[in-house]
From Swiss-Prot:
InterPro entries: Acyl_CoA_acyltransferase, Asp_Glu_LeuTrfase, N-end_Aminoacyl_Trfase, N-end_Aminoacyl_Trfase_C, N-end_Aminoacyl_Trfase_N. Its EC number is 2.3.2.29. This is Aspartate/glutamate leucyltransferase. Coiled coil: none annotated. SUPFAM superfamilies: Acyl-CoA N-acyltransferases (Nat). Transmembrane segments: none annotated. It is found in: Cytoplasm. Belongs to the R-transferase family. Bpt subfamily. It is an enzyme of class 2 (transferase). It catalyses: N-terminal L-glutamyl-[protein] + L-leucyl-tRNA(Leu) = N-terminal L-leucyl-L-glutamyl-[protein] + tRNA(Leu) + H(+); N-terminal L-aspartyl-[protein] + L-leucyl-tRNA(Leu) = N-terminal L-leucyl-L-aspartyl-[protein] + tRNA(Leu) + H(+).
């Protein structure tokens, strides 16, 4: 094998399968492996081009005659929470987010298992075992972090570590932002809007770290599962001509070239 072939990623195309988001459609994906010394740089490059990471795989939809999946990233420094978002932040003011290395725990898996059983019992991840979960967290060749959201333990002071685990986010750190790979939460906490809260927290984290964007994955117009991503404005959506800006009023325009 030549040096060129080792350093050049090989891309593969999956066979058609039923689309999990739009009824009656078929999906295909193009994917490559994220391994080796250049995995971080490759992940950055591919994420900018609309790919997502799952373990050591980077993938992007490559469906015949369908372009419904649109990569979305929130412009962190310009984002201002709406009244409803501020209410979500207030409801979760008793939580503290603790960032740590991507190491799986039985405590995390317990929440993960409950979340799948209640929210996604018929989904593709429904049968994941504790070993599968460990692979999802640990099988990364890029900079990945776990953020655990716990009840604030006020008895030990305002700066104390949290108590009971409520929610978890698996997050990649990119050169220009945070990419939310997967997040889950205690499904019994029905009034907190924890999925929304974790996105808002990531936007705040990106801003504090001086990172421009929070990557949310794919927005799919007409899919109830994915429509929530359109609420975080201003944002950018990836089109054939590049990233397009969607402002607070929902108007779309090309971003100025740097």
């Amino acid at each position: 094998m030549t040096q060129h072939s080792r350093d050049t990623p090989q891309f593969y195309l999956t066979a058609p399968s039923p689309c999990p988001y739009l009824p009656g459609r078929q999906e295909r994906k193009v994917f490559t492996h994220l391994v080796g010394d250049k995995a971080t740089d490759l992940n950055d490059l591919l994420t900018h081009g609309g790919f997502r990471r799952s373990q050591s795989i980077a993938y992007r939809p490559a469906c015949d005659q369908c372009r419904a999946c649109v990569s979305v990233r929130v412009i962190a420094n310009e984002f201002r929470p709406s009244r409803n978002f501020r209410k979500v932040l207030a409801r979760n003011s008793d939580l503290v987010g603790e960032q740590r290395s991507a190491v799986p725990t039985s405590e995390q898996y317990s929440i993960f298992r409950s979340y799948l059983d209640q929210r996604h019992r018929h989904g593709g991840m429904a049968d994941m075992t504790v070993l599968d979960y460990a692979m999802m967290v640990e099988d990364s060749h890029v900079e990945t972090r776990i953020i655990e959201y716990r009840r604030r333990n006020l008895s030990n002071g305002p700066n104390a570590r949290g108590g009971e685990l409520i929610a978890v986010a698996l997050t990649d750190v990119l050169s220009d932002g945070l990419s939310m790979v997967y997040s889950f939460f205690d499904p019994s906490e029905t009034t907190r809007s924890l999925g929304t809260f974790m996105i808002l927290d990531h936007i705040a984290r990106a801003r504090r770290q001086g990172l421009p964007y929070v990557y949310l994955g794919y927005w799919i117009e007409g899919s109830k599962k994915m429509d929530y991503k359109s609420r975080y404005l201003p944002q950018q959506r990836l089109a054939a001509a590049g990233w397009l800006r969607v402002d607070d009023e929902g108007h779309t325009a090309p971003e100025p070239q740097e």
